[in-house]
Amino acid sequence: NEHLALFDFLLQQLRQHHIKVIITPIAWWGSGYPAPDPAEPGFAVPYSKNQMNEQPKAIAAQHRYLQQLMAHKNLDGVSYAKDPNIVAFELFNEPKHAKAEPVTDYVNQLIATMRAAGVTKPLFYNISEQGNWPEFADALCASNIDGIAYQWYPTGLLKNSSIHSNVLGSVASYHNPFADIAKCQTKAKMIYEFDAADVAQTVMYPAMARSFRSAGFQWATQFAYDPAVLAASNAEYNTHYLNLLYTPGKAISLLIAGEVFRQTPRQAKLPAYPASNQFAHGSLQVLLNQAEDLALLDSGDKFYHSNSTTTAPKQPKRVAHIAGVGSSPLVQYQGSGAYFLDQISPDLWQLEVYPDVLTLQDPFQNSSLKRQVATLYAPSRTMTIDLASLGQQFYWRKVADGKNAAESSAQ
């Protein structure tokens, strides 16, 4: 199975890069998007989404599939059931249920199958795909499921053009329609996918991460990162657009969001919008400025900005990691690509600079591999770096393989 082999390779790469994984083993769709699906032999092919949880043969096939998949061994010879890099499983991607009553038994059967296959990790099930349906949520939370999975698309999907207005107010807080269902309050909570769709601004991800933590979420997955080979056309799923090369400001924004999510306590109390655009927890300080299209993080050793800023870090001598687009009091740079400065030792820093990007047209139009929404180019640029440990004079050396730190000597 070439697809499973590729998936094993992906899991290996994620593990090597210290990226933890939640797997959703059952997904109901073909492989043709955006073209029509080809004829395929999958066990879900004869059934609709509703029938997947109604037809006995479809349910039995799911049980066999889960047993086999959990027993499958990755490239390190460890079964999926026991892989320490997999932290949880979400059983079914975006299921559809016609009736609430059978949900508890159906989900419990899936859980029993996973436990019999040796899985001891937390198990999640989607609660939000059905919409605001409290009877379904009650039936789901009456099951033995460990956690419930939500989504968030506050700007909608598939507008087919960019949203230019200020939509920070729409992510000032996360509304959980099932917060009053007592059975659901003991469950773990994850966001299985989220995005500010059709928005090119760089301020949304940190705001969403802040709101997730305030609502008590323990995991959140952005949907979806565009592979560089397709990002010039944004033909993957046109309502989303995120890539370090082609949307550098949004990529830095997601980097900031990760810090916000990890450093903000669950159930943290937040001020109402617009005061929520500036917040702090411990050493973490974040500023969101829609007018300047700027997300800024200052946490002492980290200084990240998604666009040019005149704001200086509070403790410039402590800064050891810089990620930015444009200029700041520490780095003057006129290029449009992202750059990263990381301190390796007291007088040794590593600098990564990515190409400039020029946007050619609205990236959120209909998908097509024939159009080009952005292009990369690498003109000659000047960069001025003002770091205390480097002083006014330092030496640099290009690193051909891109892995070893550039050598510098402060004087």
Give the ranges of each region predicted by the language model:
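Active-site mouth of glycoside hydrolases
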Residues: 1-145
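Acidic-and-aromatic substrate-binding clefts and catalytic sites of carbohydrate-active enzymes
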Residues: 29-32, 96-100, 128-134, 156-161, ...
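Conserved beta-strand positions
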Residues: 91, 125, 150, 191-194, ...
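Flexible loop residues that form catalytic
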Residues: 94, 153, 225
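Glycoside hydrolase catalytic-domain groove-lining segments
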Residues: 134-198
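Substrate-binding cleft of secreted/luminal carbohydrate-active enzymes
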Residues: 202-276
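Catalytic cores of secreted or luminal carbohydrate-active enzymes
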Residues: 250-311
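Extended non-globular C-terminal regions
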Residues: 291-411
